Amino acid sequence: MELKQDFYYSEDHEWINTTPDEAAGKTVRVGITHVAADRLGEVVFAELPQVGDTVTAGETCGEIESTKSVSDLYSPVTGTVTAVNEDIDGAYEAINNDPYGEGWLFEVEVEEVGPLMTADEYASSNGV
């Protein structure tokens, strides 16, 4: 699986679906990278923030549980959660099979963007 070239990535393996410059004041979609999904193994549960919650860039906002481990979920942006992907509730395989599409996790109306990398920078720092 390849990284989406038009997405931006955090060092904690989350992505947003737009550029940092375009994100401020807009709603962005957030998910985990295929690198994180591969390392986790089969995802069996996701505890996500709720609509109306405030998330902060670089801070935990949920957990992803797999057959191997439980990992914290970090927000790559600061803002208010506007939507949660209800389609993955009970169908967590989408996180593994299509992390950049059907496996998205939540949407945030962005107040501030955390430090993010281009696809090439993320790939280089993670040996992808």
Language-model segments: which ranges?
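Short, charged/polar surface micro-motifs in flexible loops or helix N-caps
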Residues: 37-38, 78-81, 87-88
